Amino acid sequence: LPRPVAYGATVSTPEGIVCIGGNNSDSSLVEVSRISYNPTKGEVAVCALPPLPSPMDNLSAAFTGQEIYVAGGNENGQPCHTFLRLNLANIEKGWEQLPDFPGAARVQPVLAAGESPNGTRIYLAGGFQPILNEEEPIVPTDVLVFDPATFTWQQETVLPPFKDGTNRTLTGGCAVTFQTDKILFMGGVNYDCFLAAIARPIHLAKAEAARDSAAITRLQAEAKAYMHHPVEWYRFNTTLLQYDLSTKAWSDLGEYEQLARAGAGAVIQY
């Protein structure tokens, strides 16, 4: 890559892997690069594609046809509702601004494209909205869908809760399209553990304002211990979920310890 980068988005295309945005120790990035492999020469090449309109990180991306879609993350350092598209058959046009997705901002969401009975659709799930304007953070549990033909968003469904009734999130998880009309969702953080962590600063501020010494001590201790628990304590998602775009039905395909990751990537090899 042209320079060190993390927390960007990637998609696989017939011409290579496209790496989008991200950040490093200096700043968030607008750069978009395509990595391609020439099997005849045994060489890897990196070429630049049109940059993002603004620096973005912790975003998600999906590819369908000749188009790359990106959604969410941070834009210019702020949680956003941004939704963009790049047509690889007309890259001179650059990135196209599409309608913002509704509801909460989504940092570290997942995005996938698939074929519904009514045509191509783009599905957005997971992510979180951190504390904004002293308001409680939000971890969405719904799945949104975008119709490229009408340029409209709507709620598609909600993530199925766990067997004990607790909420599920795909924040930091993965989504990959399977057989064109199904999406596999996997990994990500635990809803309750993660929401408690990102809400802790605002709860601590309220405790300090109320001079609640017991709450202050407890919240400070929780914050200090958060990154030092045993792996099992974080309860990262191990379930492989399948969503059928034709029937709008969820299927639980089993529990796999290998899926208990946050911030990982996933691909399907046919």
Regions found by a protein language model. Give the residues of each.
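Kelch-like beta-propeller repeat domains
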Residues: 1-270
